[in-house]
Amino acid sequence: MTFILTSDVDFVSDDFLDIAYRPLKELPLTIFMTGRSEYLDKAVCENTWWETEPHPNFCAQSTHGGSISEVFSTIEQFYGDAVGFRCHKYYSSNDIEEEFANRGFSYASNICTDLVSIAPFWDRCGILQIPIFFEDGGYLKYHGVPGLDDILKRMHRDAVYVFNFHPIHLALNSCDFSTIRRLKDSMLATRYSMLSAEDARMLRNNAYGVADFLGELISYANKNNIEFLNLKQYYEKQKANRI
């Protein structure tokens, strides 16, 4: 069994990233960026087991651009030597996938399930698709607060499990999807992207929430000698074994 921890930045501030990622500093992590971040620039240099990849927004009214070419022009300013991608809201199309392949991208984690174990596969563009097993926001929306036992009973030993945690849910220890939705809707995007550590302290949920679940998941994995990888590490292993 392998656990892969991933995170979609989704335009939050560096203060929120710092709070959200503190429990993950000793673990492999794939972070999908929506823009430049001084915090991530420094953190990736300090944590060689972290990787950053682009998280482009191809949806309508995107701040990344109004067309596929405009979005790629925006994200190429911050993705560096990227090999993987995950699109905002998992938005995709044949044209988008083919453009990623033409630009040399090798893997995607752009398919989100609801606790369904789907083995990674090579798609028609030659990209390794590594589906998501658990996403915090989706689980909160449709099921409520995740409990460790509920997640574990959907797993089996010989599989890889990709988890997607958003910094907003970790920093605020979310226990209710609608609360975060109302928070986002209550302010301009510019204000949302500047929320401070003090804002996090005031808004943080003190009951059991997503951050608590992540802590239990990590403890369970460590006690049971479950392997942690980031997505790039997993891709490299699959590439080496590909016939």
Could you tell me what each predicted segment is?
Residues M1-W50, S73, Q77-D81, N94-S106, ...:
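Terminal accessory/targeting
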